[in-house]
């Protein structure tokens, strides 16, 4: 806990011994009760302020010299990453900073002071981002002035936004918008020098967000679709629409939401960093969605097909393929699509949209920032996807997935999802694959023929057995006759001839008997008559 003390020295003091012998700046005045030394040493950068009082007194008691100076040192942001929109709003609403407790800096009522020498406590300039300047008043105040009050017109100035305030109260209220924490440190000379160097580098590195610039308000971007969306705001609200500008860089926008979202890039609250790659984000939901790309988790399942996704937006976009909905339309033609990405790609390919992003290593140009980052990563780290089983390294994730499915399909320790990867045959392996296929087909044909022959033989045997059983039931000798040889058949035919003659004689005798019986019956009838 740091406190700026103004102590009385022998014969050399800015304030009299009876009134201002020992003055201490309260930490609650700057809202420092929640800070500790650990916060100062932490990598999270915070706001520093060094308050100093300097001045000179003439040889006459209570006389104010023209060289008298009262200076309040600069309030400087040292890359405060802990700022957020919600915290800034909370600070504006809470009257935690009481500026009335240090009004003695601006109003001093000298009493009995010594006549000897001068005393000077030099303030230290921390940086040149946010600055409070109290200009020297070269005129000699007359005794008619109210208690020798130093009256200046708008001595407080904020460098980033050029804001000027007449009173310290207005300026402190303005400062609360820029920072979340203000710290009073009386030993920050060395830190100030390093911070000045860092701030100069950051100012030199500030570049435009994109080459596409709006002529009406100065809005700039590197994406043509964002520029077209920006023009729609002008068409709706007119040219006098409010423009939100960033006080740290040259970013401008007409949307308050995008402006607050941009401020998080300068003042992130908490950074979520991925342990497997270089990804980081200040939003937990985005971080969770990114982790799913490593684990392969897909909690969002389509109810109409086996499709699954790690993000809800992807599932919503997929459902449009079932419903046939295409709400996104190209502004230059009648092309419609189910998502904005396809419309943007259509505009670049068909209508030759601008491609402001150029690769510094080759002639690659694009308007898509994500594709641009992926392309540059191929130059910086060409093989960043490593196989967990072998020494294989790939430049793209899809290549690694194909490698795992084709070479390590039996490994169970791999967490990467390769279910949607389709294996393909290379050009050099086509001939070998054809020979193997021909051999397999020939072997299959031979096997099929042998199976067919065995089936036919079994069918023949079963049919023969069935026929034999039926013939034996009807006539037991039919089967024997079929088995007789030719000689046996001749013998049987010779033996069968006399049998046929006997049968004929028997038939003739029977006929004679019948005729005799008929004649006898006729005779009896005539006799009776």
From Swiss-Prot:
Gene it is expressed from: rest-b
Organism per entry: Xenopus laevis
Annotated localization: Nucleus; Cytoplasm
GO molecular function: zinc ion binding
Span of zinc fingers (C2H2-type): 156-178, 212-234, 244-266, 272-294, 300-322, 328-351, 357-379, 385-408
Lineage top rank: taxon: Eukaryota
Protein name: RE1-silencing transcription factor B
Region (Disordered), start-end ranges: 188-210, 484-529
Main location (coarse class): nucleus
Gene Ontology cellular component list: cytoplasm; nucleus
Biased composition, class Polar residues, residue ranges: 518-529
PROSITE patterns: ZINC_FINGER_C2H2_2 (PS50157)
Domain topic, free-text comment: The C2H2-type zinc finger 5 is required for nuclear localization.
Pfam assignment, any one: zf-H2C2_5
């Amino acid at each position: 806990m740091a406190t700026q003390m103004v102590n009385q020295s022998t014969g050399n003091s800015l304030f009299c011994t009876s009134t201002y012998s020992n003055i201490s700046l309260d930490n609650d005045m700057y809202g420092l009760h929640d800070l500790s030394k650990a916060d100062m040493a932490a990598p999270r950068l915070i706001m520093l302020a060094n308050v100093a009082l300097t001045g000179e007194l003439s040889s006459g008691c209570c006389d104010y010299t023209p060289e008298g100076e009262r200076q309040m040192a600069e309030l400087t942001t040292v890359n405060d990453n802990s700022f957020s929109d919600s915290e800034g709003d909370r600070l504006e609403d809470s009257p935690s900073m009481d500026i009335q407790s240090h009004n003695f800096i601006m109003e001093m009522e000298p009493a009995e002071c010594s006549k000897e020498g001068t005393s000077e406590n030099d303030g230290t300039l921390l940086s040149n981002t946010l600055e409070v300047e109290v200009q020297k008043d070269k005129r000699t105040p007359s005794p008619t002035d109210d208690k020798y009050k130093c009256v200046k017109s708008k001595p407080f100035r904020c460098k980033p936004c050029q804001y000027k305030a007449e009173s310290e109260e207005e300026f402190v209220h303005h400062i609360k918008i820029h920072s979340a924490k203000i710290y009073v440190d009386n030993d920050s000379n060395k830190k100030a020098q390093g911070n000045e160097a860092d701030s100069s580098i950051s100012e030199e590195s500030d570049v435009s967000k994109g080459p596409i610039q709006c002529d009406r308000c100065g809005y700039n971007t590197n994406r043509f679709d964002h520029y077209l969306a920006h023009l729609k705001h002008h068409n709706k609200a007119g040219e006098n629409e409010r423009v939100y500008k960033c006080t740290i860089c040259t970013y401008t926008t007409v949307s308050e939401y995008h402006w607050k979202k941009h401020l998080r890039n300068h003042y992130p609250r908490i950074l979520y960093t991925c342990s497997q790659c270089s990804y980081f984000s200040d939003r937990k939901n985005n971080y969770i969605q990114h982790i799913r790309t490593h684990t392969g988790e897909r909690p969002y399942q389509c109810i109409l097909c086996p499709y699954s996704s790690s993000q809800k937006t992807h599932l919503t976009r997929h459902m449009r393929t079932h419903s046939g909905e295409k709400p996104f339309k190209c502004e230059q033609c009648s092309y419609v699509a189910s998502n904005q990405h396809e419309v943007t790609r259509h505009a670049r390919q068909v209508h030759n949209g601008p491609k402001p992003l150029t690769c510094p290593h080759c002639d690659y140009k694009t308007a898509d920032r994500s594709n641009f980052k992926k392309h540059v990563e191929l130059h910086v780290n060409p093989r960043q996807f490593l196989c967990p089983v072998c020494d294989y390294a790939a430049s793209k994730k899809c290549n690694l997935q194909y490698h795992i499915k084709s070479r390590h399909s039996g490994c169970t320790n791999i967490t990467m999802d390769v279910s949607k990867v389709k294996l393909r045959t290379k050009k050099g392996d086509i001939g070998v694959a054809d020979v193997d296929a021909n051999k397999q087909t020939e072997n299959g044909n031979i096997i099929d023929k042998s199976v067919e022959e065995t089936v036919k033989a079994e069918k023949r045997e079963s049919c023969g057995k069935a026929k034999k059983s039926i013939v034996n039931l009807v006539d037991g000798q039919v089967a024997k006759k079929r088995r007789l040889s030719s000689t046996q058949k001749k013998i049987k035919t010779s033996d069968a001839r006399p049998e046929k003659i006997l049968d004929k004689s028997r038939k003739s005798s029977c006929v004679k008997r019948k005729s005799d019986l008929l004649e006898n019956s006729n005779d009896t009838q005539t006799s009776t008559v």
